[in-house]
């Protein structure tokens, strides 16, 4: 018999680094979830841009079950067929020539930063170790990646931090140019700052970073953990901008809910990562790569990408209608199905309260700081689910505006 558990048990048993919602989801199908009490929710959070094909997608379940009936794990002393097939699919679909598999976005970014430092050290010298990142970015929670993230709130308690990491203002080429020099080994940037407020980069900004990296022989790293695998209406956001990085990191949606991460790069850069320079126990395991291979098959099609663009338009139209009614947002921004509603000054700091009210109304949304409500729904969310979910979101906005909202 299974142990009966409640939300209160989290506070009793778990390390308190999160404050989960007061309900526990127990079942999902497509873009809908149900909690322990049977209440239904439309899911516009998508596990923070992870569940790209919704919950319990039949093709992903089939891929997982098929591999689970074969074998689960061997370790990095052996390779496996699903990992090799997935690597080839990623290479064929992108600029990359080499792939490193891991288990998360943080691990992918850690590998990217280590590669950049080693490449510079091997080809130029140990003095070329500087990393330029951007304020309010997010690249993970390892000590290296949280230091690159540019949000002191996440890193200030863990000093001393890795040295030679400096932060420029996002979308400010002059600020970046002042920091990038011949001692810079890498520039790491999100094409859309997700945690930082759903802020898309300008094309000129990314083009300028590409030119600066070329001039100073630094590697350009695109952190596409959140923007990747169809989220922006292209398989990867670099395709939207027409700016090709030297290294790309991907995770989240790549596994459709099953943990996986990957670092993509060229043969020249990958060549410095010789046996023993880096590694992972679970990375590239057959369960994760079998599921991810099926995710890529489904998402990397013109039909799916066109569908993302159409759904983007549907969200924007309905969110604008909501804003006409309530006047709560100063801006609605983002690419594809990564969207952010920026709160007006009078509602500043209330994004979390709106998310809580939305859950009470039966729709799950995210926040990106205190002033931005974030949406990252499944890429195949239906028109009916968009309409129903945003009707529920409108109810949450109405409650907040009329003072009917309550903290909790």
From Swiss-Prot:
Residues with PTM N6-(pyridoxal phosphate)lysine: 252
Lineage: Bacteria, Pseudomonadati, Pseudomonadota, Gammaproteobacteria, Enterobacterales
Keyword ATP-binding: no
GO molecular function: identical protein binding; pyridoxal phosphate binding; succinylornithine transaminase activity
Pfam family, one: Aminotran_3
Top EC class, one word: transferase
Gene Ontology terms describing biological process: alpha-amino acid biosynthetic process; arginine catabolic process to glutamate; arginine catabolic process to succinate; ornithine catabolic process
Role description: Catalyzes the transamination of N(2)-succinylornithine and alpha-ketoglutarate into N(2)-succinylglutamate semialdehyde and glutamate. Can also act as an acetylornithine aminotransferase.
Matching PANTHER family: AMINOTRANSFERASE CLASS III (PTHR11986), SUCCINYLORNITHINE TRANSAMINASE (PTHR11986:SF113)
Keywords linked to the UniProt accession: Aminotransferase, Arginine metabolism, Pyridoxal phosphate, Transferase
CDD domains: OAT_like (cd00610)
Protein name: Succinylornithine transaminase
EC number: 2.6.1.81
Pathway(s) the chain acts in: Amino-acid degradation; L-arginine degradation via AST pathway; L-glutamate and succinate from L-arginine: step 3/5
Database matches in PROSITE patterns: AA_TRANSFER_CLASS_3
Needed cofactors: pyridoxal 5'-phosphate
Family note: Belongs to the class-III pyridoxal-phosphate-dependent aminotransferase family. AstC subfamily.
Reaction catalyzed: N(2)-succinyl-L-ornithine + 2-oxoglutarate = N-succinyl-L-glutamate 5-semialdehyde + L-glutamate
């Amino acid at each position: 018999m299974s142990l009966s558990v409640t939300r209160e048990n989290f506070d009793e048993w778990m390390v308190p680094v999160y404050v989960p919602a007061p309900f526990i989801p127990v079942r999902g199908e497509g873009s809908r979830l149900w909690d322990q009490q049977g209440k239904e929710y439309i899911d516009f959070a998508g596990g923070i841009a992870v569940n790209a094909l919704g919950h319990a997608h039949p093709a992903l379940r089939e891929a997982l079950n098929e591999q689970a009936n074969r074998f689960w794990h061997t370790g990095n002393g052996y390779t496996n067929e699903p990992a090799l097939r997935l690597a080839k699919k990623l290479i064929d679909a992108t600029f990359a020539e080499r792939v490193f598999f891991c288990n998360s976005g943080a691990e992918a970014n850690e590998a990217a930063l280590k590669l950049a430092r080693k490449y510079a050290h091997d080809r130029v010298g140990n003095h070329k170790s500087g990393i330029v990142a951007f304020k309010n970015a997010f690249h993970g929670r390892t000590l290296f990646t949280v230091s690159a993230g540019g949000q002191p709130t996440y890193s200030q308690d863990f000093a001393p931090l890795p040295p030679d990491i400096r932060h420029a203002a996002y979308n400010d080429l002059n600020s970046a140019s002042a920091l990038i020099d011949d001692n810079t080994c890498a520039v790491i940037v999100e094409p859309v700052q997700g945690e930082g407020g759903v802020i898309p980069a300008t094309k000129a900004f990314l083009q300028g970073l590409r030119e600066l990296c070329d001039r100073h022989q630094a590697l350009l790293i695109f952190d596409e953990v959140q923007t990747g695998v169809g989220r922006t209406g292209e398989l990867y956001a670099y395709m939207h901008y027409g700016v090709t990085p030297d290294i790309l990191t991907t995770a989240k949606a790549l596994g459709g809910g099953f943990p996986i991460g990957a670092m993509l790069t060229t043969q020249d850069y990958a060549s410095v990562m010789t046996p023993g320079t880096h590694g992972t126990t679970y990375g590239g395991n057959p369960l994760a790569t079998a599921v991810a291979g099926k995710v890529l098959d489904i998402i990397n099609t013109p039909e799916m990408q066109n569908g993302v663009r159409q759904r983007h338009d549907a969200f924007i139209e309905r969110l604008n209608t909501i804003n006409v009614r309530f006047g709560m947002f100063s801006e609605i921004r983002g690419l594809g199905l990564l969207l952010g509603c920026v709160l007006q000054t009078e509602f500043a700091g209330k994004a979390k309260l709106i998310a809580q009210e939305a859950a009470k109304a039966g729709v799950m949304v995210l926040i990106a700081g205190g002033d931005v409500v974030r949406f990252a729904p499944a890429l195949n969310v239906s028109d009916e689910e968009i309409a129903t979910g945003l009707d529920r979101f409108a109810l949450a906005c109405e409650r907040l505006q009329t003072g009917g909202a309550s903290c909790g």
